[in-house]
Amino acid sequence: MRLISVIFVTFIALFLMGCGSNRHPQLYLSYFDIKQPQVGDFEVCASSGCHKLSQLAYTANEWETICAVFESASTSPADERERIKIAVATMEQMIGTKNGTSVDAARNHHHGEGKQLDCIAEAANTTVALLLFQKENLLRYHTVGHPEHRGLLHGRLPHNTASIYENTTGDHYTVDSWFFKNGEPAVCVPVNEWKAGYDPND
């Protein structure tokens, strides 16, 4: 039943991602009943497939820590992407201590404890983080995109990721936090490269 559920949710995610560049990222979140995030009131997935949600809030000190990542102005789009990776990792650590996902392992490698997130949940949670950065004017060079999907490729399972667009060029990048365990920097590579089967371990 779990496999059927994952396949169904992946199919729905794929449907929602058709024409992803023309869709607001909130559309992906709305499928899981995740409302537009606020610093003091936001929701994230707390299980694979995003079947369970946690309603959380950042304290003033926590949000100050996140803002500090962007405190000095980014010098280039590439520099901002590096900061985004660090900020997403910082947010994952904070969220993990609040809802038990701190033991989330890399990929789908379960360890028999805590709460494991799959790529569907990771894409949603990272999109929540990115929308908060955008809402709070922390992003200078990028705009949050609709999550992206890649299908069966080179013997690999379907996969989802959050995404961003570079404002001046329109270049499209992943912000993929699924490959590594909770609190590690996300993968940020061109979407075309990611769709071709990118894996950081290759």
Give names to the regions the model predicted:
Residues 1-8:
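Bacterial N-terminal signal peptides that target proteins for export
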Residues 46-78, 104-112:
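Acidic/histidine-rich, surface-exposed loop or edge segments in extracytoplasmic proteins
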Residues 194-202:
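Low-complexity, Gly/Ser/Thr/Pro-rich intrinsically disordered linker/tail segments
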Residues 20-23:
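Bacterial signal peptide processing site
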Residues 79-142:
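Mid-length scaffold segments of soluble, non-membrane domains
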Residues 16-18:
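C-terminal motif of bacterial Sec signal peptides marking the signal peptidase cleavage site
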Residues 26-53:
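Post-signal peptide N-terminal segment of mature Sec-exported envelope proteins
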Residues 131-194:
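Hydrophobic/aromatic-rich core segments of domains that either
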